[in-house]
Amino acid sequence: IRMDWKGWRQDANPTKDYEMFKLVREFLSEGQYLGFDANNGYSVSTAIQQGRKFEELGIDHFEEPLPNWDLPGLKQVADALDVAVSAGEQDAYRWWFHHLVLLGDPDILQPDILSAGGPSEVKKIFDLATMWNKPVMPHSPQAGINSMASLHTYSTVQNATRPHEFSTEFSGPLDDVHELYGDVVIPIKGQMHLSDRPGLGIELNETAVTKLTL
C-alpha cells in the first residue's frame, strides 16, 4: 500500500490510511506479504502510532514513514517499532547511506538504481549493507530498463531477502512496456526470470519505439 506523494502534507489523514491498510490486510490471504509506504508523510509521533496499529493487523515492512532528511526522527521510529522500517529510495551514493545507517538506523535499505548512482554504486551499497547486517529491498517504480538493471544487481547479493518492487508508476501502461522490451521484463506468476544475454538482456523493439515516440 502506498500513500499519494503528489500533494504532500504531513499527517494528512492517518485514520483513512489505517482503514485502507485494514481493508487490504483482510482481503489478502494469510501469509501474503504486505508493506505500507507512507511516502515521507508522517511526523515521528504519528508514524509510531500508525506503526503500532499496523503491527496489530500484521505488516511486513513500513516504508519511508518520515521525510528523508529527518534521520534522528527515523531512528526514533525504528527503535520504537517491531516492524522493519525501510528508507533510502531518495538517497544517492554510499556515503549518504553511511550517514543513513549511522544516524537513522533503518532496518531495511532501499536504494534506487537511478538515483543512488547506477549498478556499480548500488552494488557497493549492497556490500556495505551486508557489513551492517541490513537486508536490502530496492526501490524501482519503472518496469522495463530500470527494473531489469535493479534486478540484475539485486540478484548478486546475499542479503536480497525481500520482494523486489514491480511498478509501472513512471513507465506507462504495462502493455507498452511489454511491446518495447519483450517478455523478459514481464513477471511470470510473481517471479522474474533474468536473461543471460549481454547487458540487461533487453532488445528494444524498434517498431514499438517509432510507434510510441511523441
Protein language model regions, located:
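Metal-dependent enolase-superfamily TIM-barrel catalytic cores that perform enediolate-based chemistry
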Residues: 1-81
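Extended hydrophobic packing segments that form well-structured cores
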Residues: 198-214
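Glycine- and other small-residue-rich loops at beta-strand/loop junctions that grip anionic moieties
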Residues: 10-13, 36-43, 63-66, 88-89, ...
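Helix-coil boundary/capping segments in enzymes
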Residues: 192, 196-198
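Short, electropositive, low-hydrophobicity segments enriched in small/polar residues
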Residues: 62, 92, 194, 203-205
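Shared catalytic-loop signature of beta/alpha-barrel
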Residues: 52, 58, 69-191
